[in-house]
């Protein structure tokens, strides 16, 4: 669950980047995208705090969380600039530069999420190897104990034979009769 959750975080961080660029392109073409803006806002909140609805886990990584706080602030600034674009047009605003700045922050956030996910996957792989080694060791111990039990059973048969048979004649002795 947790590894899949971190992979979803990486995907959504990339989705924020791509969706925002699409929003800017469409807004600059005078096609308002309030629905997409709301989606990106909810994606950012999900990336910061986790979201059951989006099936996003909250990454416990300080660098990622700091970058997401920065990204959230930058998106709020970008939304204000989008409102300005709707009023005066894209050529009278700083929307392109702000969009580029936002893209760079998204890139960094996506990279941090990917690095975190890779660290988690590496730890999981190590734990899987330890578990496999433990299983092999347990099977070896069980096999060793089985071998010892078979040795003891064989020795027991030999001793029972010695206890109940006369060695000189091979016939049952008095212990067998009692």
Residue ranges and their predicted role:
Residues 29-32, 46-49, 84, 115-118, ...:
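Heptad-repeat coiled-coil alpha-helices
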Residues 4-7, 11-14, 59, 66, ...:
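Primarily heptad-repeat coiled-coil rod domains in cytosolic scaffolding/tethering proteins
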Residues 90-130:
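Juxtamembrane amphipathic/coiled-coil helical coupling segments that flank
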């Amino acid at each position: 669950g947790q590894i899949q959750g971190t992979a979803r975080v990486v995907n959504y961080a990339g989705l924020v980047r791509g969706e925002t660029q699409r929003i800017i392109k469409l807004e600059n073409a005078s096609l308002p995208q309030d629905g997409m803006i709301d989606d990106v806002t909810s994606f950012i909140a999900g990336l910061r705090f986790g979201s059951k609805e989006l099936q996003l886990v909250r990454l416990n990584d300080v660098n990622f969380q700091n970058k997401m706080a920065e990204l959230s602030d930058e998106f709020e600034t970008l939304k204000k600039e989008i409102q300005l674009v709707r009023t005066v047009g894209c050529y009278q605003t700083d929307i392109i530069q702000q969009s580029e700045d936002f893209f760079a922050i998204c890139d960094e956030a996506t990279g941090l999420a990917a690095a975190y996910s890779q660290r988690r996957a590496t730890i999981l792989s190590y734990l899987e190897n330890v578990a496999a080694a433990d299983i092999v060791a347990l099977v070896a111990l069980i096999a060793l104990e089985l071998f010892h039990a078979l040795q003891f059973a064989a020795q027991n048969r030999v001793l029972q034979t010695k206890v109940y048979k006369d060695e000189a004649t091979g016939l049952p002795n008095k212990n067998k009769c009692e």
